[in-house]
């Protein structure tokens, strides 16, 4: 850096090359921000598309692989989280952040044209000549041309992204303390004496919104460096103050949920990668207090049949699934699940829903359990709150009943309309165990039909009719089609 001159201007003095190079360094970074934004949006868009495909894969696995219900559901939720992450990344650019990228591009354009103008006003010849508008800070002599390379003025619309930090670039520019006017030379026509060269010119001429100023008497205004002008400069100040946040969002890399056997292997082949599934698995299990496994990695390895560095049993099971999907009009083709494109997966989901509907229509529903009077009373009588009572598909609250123990009553008509199969109850009104589970030990009590709760093996089958189950599954699948 060079010491500041006295607060006096000299008509025709050039811009100091040090200051010019600082402006160019900033401009080179600023003009790449649109490319950086395009890269970020492309990453997020691709992640969202792939994660939607992963959702469809997991939904099909949920229907086709009952032994891997928890694994498929965990990946379905994980894919949903990834879609949400991608959407959040895209939404970063719906307001001020995009405006700031535009400001960076705008400021770069203004700097480039000024620098090309100043550098172009020079005497042709070797270094040492002083007839120039962009000269050495010490002495003002002509310097080698640098604007095209330092400002990168020749780049077109297809400029490459570089992950550069616009906030840091604006800060660096704002720290330049070199006086803008070179200490020698007096031949620049652009910085001539405005007051004498024109019949009248009462005011100074600000450039770049006041980052630089041509004094009314000529030359660049001394004592006003980029450092002193930048804090209030509309071209730069917002990028200096908020550019770091923009840079952080531009650097965001949105990952996608797995859609291939290799991607599943990567996600499940190490403890660090498997840990990414914890939030999704916790959401699926909705653990009761004290029920969550202390060793998540051991749990998730068991769920997927995973081992370090190997394909998981779940991934291999997916490899064994092939489904007929439409191709040309009137024809179908059997495709392996991993090879399916989104259109194929959508057709496979529709076909799977149709299969479930057909199966539900051809199988007679399980006979309803006829409740005794004592059992029906036990289902509802312990509920005291009216809202809770009425929320049950088989209870209704009778506000006129004087006996508080009988206000919540069993409603057989409501139960029939709801389609809910009623649980058997024990002598104390608690849910009874079924014959197939009640005599099993803790080790024998296994899913999918039985579940150990407390000190008893209980029937874990879903207490809903086939029609109700179908509506839930169909709704879940249909939501993935759009």
UniProtKB/Swiss-Prot annotation:
It holds the Pfam family Trypan_glycop. Keywords: Cell membrane, Disulfide bond, Glycoprotein, GPI-anchor, Lipoprotein, Membrane, Signal, Trypanosomiasis. One of its GO terms (cellular component) is side of membrane. Gene3D superfamilies: 3.30.1680.30, 3.30.1680.40, Variant Surface Glycoprotein, subunit A domain 1, Variant Surface Glycoprotein, subunit A, domain 2. InterPro entries: Trypano_VSG_A_N_dom, Variant_surf_glycoprt_trypan_C. It is a lipid-anchor; GPI-anchor. Disulfide bonds join 24-151, 133-188. A lipid is attached at residue 459 (GPI-anchor amidated aspartate). It is found in: Cell membrane. Residues 460-482 form a propeptide. GO terms for biological process: symbiont-mediated evasion of host immune response. Glycans are attached at residues 92, 398, 411. Residues 1-8 form the signal peptide. VSG forms a coat on the surface of the parasite. The trypanosome evades the immune response of the host by expressing a series of antigenically distinct VSGs from an estimated 1000 VSG genes. This is Variant surface glycoprotein ANTAT 1.1C.
């Amino acid at each position: 850096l060079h010491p500041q001159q006295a607060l006096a201007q000299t008509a025709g003095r050039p811009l100091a090359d040090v200051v010019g190079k600082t402006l160019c360094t900033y401009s080179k970074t600023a003009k790449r921000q649109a490319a950086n934004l395009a890269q970020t949006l492309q990453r997020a868009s691709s992640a969202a598309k792939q994660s939607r495909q992963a959702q469809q894969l997991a939904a099909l696995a949920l229907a086709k692989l009952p032994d891997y219900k928890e694994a498929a559901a965990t990946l379905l939720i994980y894919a949903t989280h990834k879609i949400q992450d991608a959407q959040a990344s895209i939404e970063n650019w719906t307001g001020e952040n995009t405006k700031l990228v535009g400001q960076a591009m705008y400021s770069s354009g203004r700097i480039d044209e000024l620098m090309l103008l100043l550098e172009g006003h020079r005497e042709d010849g070797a270094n040492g000549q002083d007839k120039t508008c962009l000269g050495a800070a010490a002495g003002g002599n002509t310097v080698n041309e640098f604007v095209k390379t330092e400002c990168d003025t020749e780049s077109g619309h297809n400029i490459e992204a570089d992950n550069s930090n616009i906030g840091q670039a604006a800060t660096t520019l704002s720290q330049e303390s070199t006086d803008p006017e070179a200490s020698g030379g007096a031949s620049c026509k652009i910085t001539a004496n405005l007051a004498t060269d024109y019949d009248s010119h009462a005011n100074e001429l600000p450039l770049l919104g006041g980052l630089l100023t041509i004094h009314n008497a000529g030359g660049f205004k001394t004592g006003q460096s980029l450092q002193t002008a930048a804090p209030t400069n509309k071209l730069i100040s917002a990028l200096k103050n908020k550019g770091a946040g923009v840079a952080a969002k531009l650097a965001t890399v949105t990952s996608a949920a797995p859609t291939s056997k290799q991607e599943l292997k990567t996600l499940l082949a190490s403890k660090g990668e498997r840990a990414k599934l914890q939030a999704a698995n916790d959401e699926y299990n909705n653990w009761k207090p004290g029920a969550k496994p202390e060793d998540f990695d051991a749990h998730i390895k068991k769920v997927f049949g995973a081992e370090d560095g190997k394909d998981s049993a779940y991934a291999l099971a997916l490899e064994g699934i092939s489904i007929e999907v439409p191709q040309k009009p009137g024809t179908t083709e059997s495709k392996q699940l991993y090879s399916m494109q989104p259109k194929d997966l959508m057709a496979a989901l529709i076909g799977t829903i149709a299969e479930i509907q057909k199966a539900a229509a051809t199988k007679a529903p399980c006979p309803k359990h006829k409740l005794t009077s004592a059992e029906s009373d036990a289902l509802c009588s312990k509920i005291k709150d009216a809202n809770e009572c009425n929320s049950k598909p088989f209870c209704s609250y009778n506000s006129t009943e004087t006996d508080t123990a009988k206000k919540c009553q069993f409603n057989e008509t409501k139960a029939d309309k709801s389609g809910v199969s009623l649980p058997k109850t024990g002598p104390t009104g608690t849910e009874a165990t079924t014959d197939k589970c009640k005599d099993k030990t803790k080790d024998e009590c296994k899913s999918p039909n039985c579940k150990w709760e407390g000190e008893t093996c209980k029937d874990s089958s879903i207490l809903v009719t086939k029609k109700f189950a179908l509506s839930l599954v169909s709704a879940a699948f249909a939501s993935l089609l759009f």
